[in-house]
Amino acid sequence: KSTSCMEAGSYCGSTTRICCGYCAYSASKNVCDYPSN
């Protein structure tokens, strides 16, 4: 199945699509980010 995910830098939250990486929470805003490896 094809999954639609949000790229890094996109706003993430309970009402948004799943991030391609993960949702990075901060005090000002929550944005999608990729794991650093």
Curated annotation (Swiss-Prot):
Propeptide feature: residues: 1-4
Localization, UniProt: Secreted
Signal peptide: none
Tissue: Expressed by the venom duct.
Disulphide bridges, residue numbers: C5-C20, C12-C23, C19-C32
Recorded GO MF terms: calcium channel regulator activity; toxin activity
Record-level GO cellular component terms: extracellular region; host cell presynaptic membrane
Keywords per UniProt: Amidation, Calcium channel impairing toxin, Disulfide bond, Ion channel impairing toxin, Knottin, Neurotoxin, Presynaptic neurotoxin, Secreted, Toxin, Voltage-gated calcium channel impairing toxin
Free-text comment on this protein's domains from its UniProt entry: The presence of a 'disulfide through disulfide knot' structurally defines this protein as a knottin.
Record function comment: Omega-conotoxins act at presynaptic membranes, they bind and block voltage-gated calcium channels (Cav). This toxin blocks N-, P- and Q-type calcium channels.
Family affiliation: Belongs to the conotoxin O1 superfamily.
Name of protein: Omega-conotoxin-like S6.7
Organism of origin: Conus striatus (Striated cone)
